[in-house]
């Protein structure tokens, strides 16, 4: 850098200033639009807050800086190259660029040749667009941009997660159909990290957060061996991923679920060989580095609906409901899943109910009340007693 504030703080290339907070967030609140970038950065390298040992990020010792460059992305990429950036996370998606896709691809290729590993979520457009345009720019760029699709906690594909392949038929690129995405990560029911360092359960959905998991994994790998190039990273992370869908590479989850532990071990194994050291302790499988997919899915058949973010002055707030409370029933119907909620709400409409009985649980305490038809005033999330990883 040149010693100016952007070296550590980042830069807004659209406004040509250092303002990266475009939407203010009041203390004690969560604004999904305002904190989208904050959450992405937290997933990559968040370290929690003072006095709280909980580390939120995948690579908590990594350093990050932000850029805003919707209109001047070339300047942002050039700046990242000059700053010596290792990886560059892009949780946005642009449709319908036509021939201009070639320009994006060329810029990303140049950045990749300069050593930057570009990462993006696969997009959230499976229910809105057809293949091969579910994945848009930049996640549709081959080789230079790595895309992460999304799975739920039970490893089923998230319905909105965009699928490949993509297609390239421009004046400059004639690849035809190209396999995408590269891998997948969790993208549904993720915890929120608030500005004060506290967390709220299961409040985030979207491939905007699968991409940063990919980016964090790459940062972790680079901490083990900073000399790796983008194509090395891609080969290692795809070869160590855990297959969670159709056998082999597929258009929904790519090579499979990112396995950070195995990826870093493979990095250390290759590094040991390159340095003429014994790679033995990094070779082979270990207990805990393999997922028992069938066993975990069986345990995850039992779920509950927990309260995520509570809307101020909404029906749930007026009843005194807090994040973490469990919705037991709605309209006298048991609610243990999102589908249960949908069925119960449809039945309430069919019954033309003017008042709907709701039951919540907070520990041993039961909270009963009545809702009017309409928004419940909280974001429901699915929780399980079993951890995903053992």
Residue ranges and their predicted role:
Residues 43-44, 67-69, 86, 183, ...:
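Hydrolase catalytic cores
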Residues 316-339:
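Conserved PDZ fold ligand-binding element
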Residues 1-72, 113, 140-145, 154, ...:
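Subtilisin-like serine protease catalytic core
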Residues 47-51, 64-144, 177-178, 195-211:
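Substrate-binding/access-modulating region of protease and related hydrolase catalytic domains
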Residues 322, 328, 343-387:
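PDZ-domain C-terminal substructure recognizer with occasional recognition of PDZ-binding tails
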Residues 40, 88, 217, 316, ...:
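Terminal peptide-recognition signature
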Residues 2-3, 16, 136-223:
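Extracellular S/T/G-rich loop segment that most often corresponds to the catalytic His/Ser-adjacent loop
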Residues 123, 261-283:
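Secreted peptidase-domain scaffold signal
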């Amino acid at each position: 850098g040149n010693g100016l504030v952007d070296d550590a703080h980042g830069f807004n290339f659209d406004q040509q200033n250092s303002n990266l907070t475009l939407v203010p967030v009041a203390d004690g609140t969560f604004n999904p639009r305002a904190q989208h970038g904050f959450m992405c950065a937290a997933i990559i390298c968040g370290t929690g807050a003072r006095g709280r040992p909980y580390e939120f990020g995948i690579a908590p010792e990594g350093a990050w800086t932000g850029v805003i460059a919707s209109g001047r992305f070339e300047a942002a990429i050039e700046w990242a190259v000059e700053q010596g950036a290792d990886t560059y996370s892009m949780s946005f998606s642009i449709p319908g660029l036509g021939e201009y896709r070639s320009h994006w691809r060329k810029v990303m290729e140049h950045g990749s040749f300069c050593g930057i590993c570009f990462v993006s979520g696969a997009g959230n457009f499976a229910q809105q667009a057809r293949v091969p345009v579910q994945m848009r720019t930049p996640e549709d760029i081959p080789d230079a941009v790595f895309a992460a699709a999304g799975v739920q906690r039970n490893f089923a594909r998230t319905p909105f997660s965009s699928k490949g392949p993509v297609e390239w038929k421009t004046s400059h690129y004639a690849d035809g159909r190209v396999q995408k995405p590269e891998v997948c990560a969790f993208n549904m029911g993720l915890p929120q990290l608030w500005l004060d360092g506290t967390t709220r359960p299961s409040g985030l959905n979207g491939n905007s957060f699968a991409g940063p998991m990919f980016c964090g994994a790459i940062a972790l790998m680079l901490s083990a061996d900073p000399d790796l190039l983008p194509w090395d990273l891609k080969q290692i992370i795809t070869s160590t991923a855990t297959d969670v869908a159709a056998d082999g590479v597929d258009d929904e989850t790519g090579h499979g679920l990112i396995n950070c532990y195995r990826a870093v071990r493979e990095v250390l194994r290759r590094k040991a060989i390159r340095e003429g050291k014994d790679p033995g302790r990094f070779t082979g499988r270990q207990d805990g580095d393999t997922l028992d997919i069938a066993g975990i899915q069986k345990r995850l058949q039992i779920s509950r609906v927990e309260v995520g973010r509570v809307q101020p002055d909404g029906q749930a707030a007026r009843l005194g409901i807090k994040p973490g409370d469990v919705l037991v029933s709605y309209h006298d119907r048991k609610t243990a899943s999102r589908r249960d909620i949908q069925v119960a709400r449809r039945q309430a409409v069919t019954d033309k109910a003017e008042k709907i009985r709701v039951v919540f649980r907070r520990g041993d305490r039961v909270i009963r009340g009545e809702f009017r038809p309409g928004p419940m005033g909280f974001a429901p999330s699915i929780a399980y007693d079993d951890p995903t990883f053992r």
